[in-house]
Amino acid sequence: MQNARMKAHIPTLSLAEVETPQFVSAIGEAYEQYGFVIIENHGIPQELIDRFLDQFKTFFAWTESEKRRFHIEGGGGARGYTPFGIETAKGSAHFDLKEFWHIGRELPEGHPYRHYMADNVWIDAIPRFRETCIEMFDTFDRTGRRLLTAIARVLKLAPDYFEDKVQLGNSVLRVIHYPPMPPNPTESIRAGAHEDINVITLLLGAEEPGLQVLTKQGEWLSVNPAPGSMVVNVGDMLQRLTNGALRSTSHRVINPVSDRAKNARFSMPFFLHFNPDFPIAALPSCVGPGRPEPLPPILAEEYLQERLREIKLK
């Protein structure tokens, strides 16, 4: 058992091989075992990542009063700035030690999904802010849909199965700032143990130590991606669709120790969602003898709102 624990690690795959049978087999095994995978050669340009992150480092360095001008009271953190002391992991008594910004999908006036998606918040004082945010959102979105072609093949579905089910999803790009730790101990951690609500999450910026995944054996496994790599995990919506065949795994971001406690941490998760009116119901191939009893169907938007209330964003 000890030897198995020592060898446990999150697999690393190259997105350049996404169409190969080997990639499909490997990502399927990773998601059944861990719910997580590390992706290299993801195709998001480093220049775009650096430009995007630099803009938010500028914003998060502003004073609290300056930042709160971009917080939408009563908006549930759907867009713009969410300050410290609000988001709390499901079942936790302590809020997460982070502040963040949300960017959503841009839809034209009159679009039938507009009432599901709040308007984005833009900062005129930061050059190219809107342009860069939209470019980053769209790039993440394309990358996620490309990964979903492999996940569809894992499930013995057509590669384009997910395309019309996520192309107008209420997906969210979040930019998180975890500040340097205070000198006094705290009961809160940077991000309490939780599962993601959505279909899949694509995460950049996980190189700084702290991200951990809860294994089937009930042990916390550190995720250590190479610089520039992306971490991609299964969310609760995909777990529900597959009746648990693909795992939405508890994960957390623990507080750093020693000199690392002096470092801020920035990360960029993209939460890819189904279209709001997509009914999440267990796939027929994931139901039957030896499988769990499936949960009842629920619309993606209803499920999202239910879960947002649990984490105190509603």
Predicted ranges, named:
Residues 1-314:
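Peripheral, non-catalytic segments flanking oxidoreductase cores
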